[in-house]
A protein has these predicted regions:
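Function-dense linear segments that define catalytic or interfacial modules
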Residues: 1-3, 14-17, 75-174
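Conserved, charged catalytic cores of large soluble enzymes
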Residues: 4-9, 16-93, 164-182
Length: 182
């Protein structure tokens, strides 16, 4: 709990004083860890600047006592806890990025970017995706990642993710309902 509070305070400081004023820290704890109950039930105000995630396997889920499982489900419903299925690449465990969208080898990195569909004309969407992905791939090599040895080099690990936002705005602009879209 103490380490979580330190990381929460650090993230608050970086978010408020940093150049980009953003950042995210996700604390992960395996469901098999003896402190999982305390991790799940720590009040949001005790860790306001971090997200919490419980890593599970089918075995750990089955081994978890019913009361702790209920607390975990309650925390997920409240938006205080994320759930992450443990993944492996061969025999090596791989970890999710902050948003649990991309799974990485140890010391791996990824760059994420989005296309704002709400700012696009319909016919521009394919070009926006192509240009966005090209920018991400070019940027990865320019970040300096890998030069210190702290992270894998871009030649060994070049993971990028291109997502979308603004779908509701795009649909509204073109008069398409969710029912029609789905």
């Amino acid at each position: 709990k103490r380490q979580g509070r330190i990381l929460s305070a650090l993230n608050e400081t970086l978010r408020r004083g940093g150049k980009y004023k953003n950042g995210a820290i996700v604390l992960h704890l395996d469901a098999s860890h003896p402190d999982v109950d305390e991790f799940i039930t720590t009040p949001r105000e005790a860790l306001p600047w971090v997200k919490r995630c419980v890593n599970v396997t089918p075995e750990w889920w089955e081994d978890m006592d019913v009361i702790t499982r209920q607390k975990l489900i309650k925390g997920i419903k409240a938006g205080d806890i994320w759930l992450n299925k443990v993944k492996y690449e061969g025999t090596k465990r791989i970890r999710g990025n902050v948003c649990l969208e991309v799974y990485l080898p140890s010391r791996g990195t990824c760059l994420l970017q989005h296309v704002n569909l709400g700012a696009c004309q319909f016919e521009d969407i394919p070009r926006a995706f192509s240009e966005g992905m090209s920018q991400l791939c070019a940027l990865h090599a320019d970040t300096g990642v890998g030069k210190t040895g702290e992270y894998l080099s871009p030649a060994e690990d070049r993971q990028v993710g291109l997502g979308v936002l603004g779908l509701a705005n795009l649909l509204r602009r073109y008069g398409v309902t969710y029912e029609q879209f789905g």
